[in-house]
Amino acid sequence: MISDAEKDKIKEEIVSKVNSVLEKNNESFRMDKVNILKKSESIKFMGNYRVYDRKNYNAVSKEINTFLKEYGDVDIKSKKIRDSGMKFTAVSFNFEL
């Protein structure tokens, strides 16, 4: 089991990296936190972000996914959304340590 300090460090790294990739690609969305779920033998990290410019999606997701895979097996799901005239791709991810 990992310590609380390690969990906090991982959460901060993920938020910082995701936000820097989004900012670099001129995306307006910023991730504010990563959630954790404590299981008996592991910790599950879960988060999501949005990409508004669909032309940026491949570059953004490739860079973020590469970073997330450094933590091991990552489950990544994306869905194109059209909400009140706004179009974006919602991406969720989770992994266990």
Please place each PLM-identified region on the residue numbering:
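Short amphipathic beta-strand and strand-loop transition segments with alternating hydrophobic
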Residues: 32-36, 75-83
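C-terminal edge-of-domain segments
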Residues: 79-97
